[in-house]
Design a protein with these regions (language model features):
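Short, flexible loop/turn elements at secondary-structure junctions
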Residues: 60-61, 84, 109-111, 139, ...
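A contiguous active-site-proximal alpha/beta segment in oxidoreductase catalytic domains
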Residues: 77-79, 85-165
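Secondary-structure transition/capping motifs at alpha-helix termini
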Residues: 97-103, 126-130, 210-214, 240-247
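Rossmann-like dinucleotide-binding domain that binds NAD(P)(H)
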Residues: 164-246
């Protein structure tokens, strides 16, 4: 995701790149040979802060907050990938920081950036299909493992990966390939599961078109769940209050 975002910033001067696994990031590094490379984002800001106007954050969910919040306090404009944060507290913190430091912020959500999303919103709001009382959303996710138990083995960590930096603020544990580079989405300590990863894409257009606010109730059921990993499948029903008539 980060590499794709950077390709859409081809008109900008990319001065620094940061990734905890330089093997995984090799293709991106080669795309921008003039950019200085880092593993630790804190070191990047210390050394390159004066040369950086804005940052793009596309790390695993659990490290969005620490990187983005620090950047905002340094007066850097931020584009952070969805889901914006790993907790409600972090979202509220971002709101306070952005207001205090007056920087431009945006959450990356490609599902809400296409013309079809705006077109459907216009259709619904103009009454083309009449009143909408019920909407069904679904996804083929997870396409990564979920419903897993905590691994008991501890394979050797690749030399190119700084495991301590990858773990970041999460509870420390031995390296295991079941966590990274892709499967972190299916672990509560690092990701938000299929619902957190995809609802922002497929539910946001509904919120936009129907001008929805907060739900009055949320009821969920799922396959067997545990404290470590989101369930294999789930059904969640959101109920919203009646909307005020426009016009």
């Amino acid at each position: 995701m980060g590499r794709r975002n950077l390709k859409n910033m081809s008109t900008e001067n990319i001065v620094a790149l940061c990734d905890v696994d330089w093997h995984y990031a090799d293709k991106t590094f080669k795309d921008y040979p003039q950019a200085k490379r880092y593993k630790d984002w804190r070191q990047m800001f210390d050394e390159m802060g004066k040369s950086i106007d804005a940052v793009m954050v596309a790390t695993p969910d659990h490290t969005h907050a620490c990187v983005t919040a620090h950047a905002i306090t340094l007066g850097k404009h931020c584009y952070t990938q969805k889901p914006l944060t790993h907790s409600v507290y972090e979202s509220r913190l971002f709101t306070k920081l952005a207001k205090k430091y007056r920087v431009a912020t945006q959450m990356g959500n490609q599902g809400n950036s296409f013309d079809w999303c705006r077109q459907i919103t216009e259709w619904i709001q103009s009454g083309v299909i009449g009143e909408v009382y019920e909407v069904h959303c679904w996804t083929d996710r997870p396409i990564w493992p979920q419903g897993l138990m905590k691994p008991s083995d501890s394979p050797k960590c690749p030399k190119t990966l700084d495991w301590d930096l990858w773990i970041g603020p999460a509870e420390k544990r031995p390296y295991n390939p079941v966590y990274t580079p892709w499967n972190w989405r299916g672990w509560w300590d690092f990701g938000t599961g299929a619902l957190g990863d995809m609802a922002c894409h497929i539910m946001d257009p509904v919120y936009w078109a129907l001008d929805l606010k907060y739900p009055t109730s949320v009821i969920g059921s799922s396959t067997l769940s545990n404290l470590y990993s989101p369930p294999h499948a789930q059904v969640v029903t959101y109920t919203f209050p009646a909307r005020q008539q426009k016009g």
